[in-house]
Regions:
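Short, solvent-exposed loop/turn segments that connect beta-strands within catalytic domains
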Residues: 128-133, 146-149
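Sensory-domain boundary capping and coupling elements
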Residues: 156-157
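PAS/PAC sensory module
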Residues: 120, 134-140
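Alpha-helical transmembrane segments and their helix-membrane boundary motifs
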Residues: 1-28, 98
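Sensory modules in modular signal-transduction proteins
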Residues: 29-66
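Short loop/turn elements at sensory-signaling interfaces that couple input to output
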Residues: 138-153
Length: 161
């Protein structure tokens, strides 16, 4: 076999590998885009696409609360304006975060890779005037994968007191 044959073979294999990598990348990008679209289509709940560290990747929270400033770190408790998260600087760092029922359920759901629903809790939230209020919430979560990366689509609904 001559040298030209090997050069063409290597070039062909390289092109095929590049095409496969691009296809995988586009598939993951499309999966993520579909999840983001689902987040913004929901209007009766606050929707959060979060990773294992509770970092918010997408949300409709600020679209539904135009009077609330988008000035918090993109971590679940901070975006929701949880009093403990804001007072401590970051969701998950306060002493009360260890007993937060929402945090415990989501952590467990990530470990078990299972959906959860109808979790009710009372949250201490700040309103737009930075006044602390007690708010009953119902939380549901749906496991979603982008490629092999697990995320949760978390739905939070306020329950009137």
């Amino acid at each position: 076999m001559n040298m030209t044959y090997w050069i063409y073979l290597i070039a062909f294999v390289t092109v095929v590998a590049i095409v496969l990598v691009v296809r995988v990348w586009l598939k993951r990008k499309n999966e993520y885009a579909l999840l983001c679209e689902r987040v913004h289509q929901q209007t009766e709940h606050y929707i959060f696409l979060i990773d294992r560290k509770f970092r918010v990747k997408e949300t409709n929270f600020y679209e539904l609360n135009e009077d609330i400033k988008d000035d918090q770190p993109y971590v679940l408790g901070n975006v929701l304006h949880c009093q403990t998260a804001i007072d401590e600087g970051l969701c998950g760092t306060g002493i009360d975060c260890n007993t937060c029922p929402i945090r415990m359920v989501i952590n467990n759901a990530f470990k078990l890779k299972r959906n959860f629903d109808h979790v009710e809790a009372v949250m201490h939230l700040y309103d737009k005037d930075h006044k602390a209020i007690l708010q009953d919430v119902r939380v549901d979560g749906e496991l979603a994968f982008v490629g092999k990366e697990p995320f949760f689509l978390v739905k939070v609904r306020k329950i009137n007191r």
